[in-house]
Amino acid sequence: MKSPRNIFRAQGPTSEGFIVVVVLWLLGALSVLASIYSVYVVNSAAAFAVQDEQLRGEALFSAALELTAYKHLTQQTHPTSGQFSFHFGQANIAVKFRPETARIDLNAAPKQLLAGLFRALGARPDDADTYGERIVAWRTVQPNAQDSEASAYRVAGLGYQPRGAKFPHANELALVRDIPSSLTERALKFVTVYSGQPQVNILDAPTEVIAALPGMSPNQISAFLLQRDASPQDAKSLLPAEAQQFATVEGGKAIRVLTRIVFDNGRQQSAEAVIVITEDRERPFAILSWRDDSIGMLADSQQ
């Protein structure tokens, strides 16, 4: 029979081995926890950096709009369009602005101008005239709910009728019947609901809008685009007689502002807003629409 001393001596190495295993297990668990924590810290830092960048971007977008309004209000000859840039908050900011009168207003433009835009975008003349008629019918108040236009929408199985009021947003153009979606998508770059004018500003209008004016041949369009910058005061007289009634050189108070931000770390943000200049010194402008490329959505605010 072994003495107690011998028994403890025999069991000693086993106990020591068990303790070593436990210690190693604890060290392994701690190393895993340390790894998890380090990943958490890195991800949290990245998330906070992105959030900080978004907040800085919002502040810089607001600054761009304020500077645009300031230029419009303080310069003796109000620029109808232009661009400027500045560096602030570890970022380069480039701003371009153009009046909404450079676009065709869906609520105010006559049928001829609307049809002219679709012709300029490649539609056949007869089809373009039909599209122009459909837009005018959509925005026109119909005294009788059973009118032929509403009936046509029901027959087409669209499940809705013409609004019978102004377009609240240019994207509603997609609801007007018979206009191909491909044409609608292209037309959205050249239409607005914020101009309020039946004419277009020929000094700032893009080529497609100039081509929408009645009586403009390809040669006349090219000649006009070459001469309008050299003689802006004579721009209207450069147009054929039938186009002059649809032309203006007024900028209007609604301005579309495109802002692009490039941070020093290489990240970029951009936003497009439509603002209206007011006479209120405390609130010199109001935002009518906003589109941020980070969310790809357009929000409207009637302010």
What are these regions (language model features)?
Residues K2-R9, S15-Q303:
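Compositionally biased linear targeting/interaction segments
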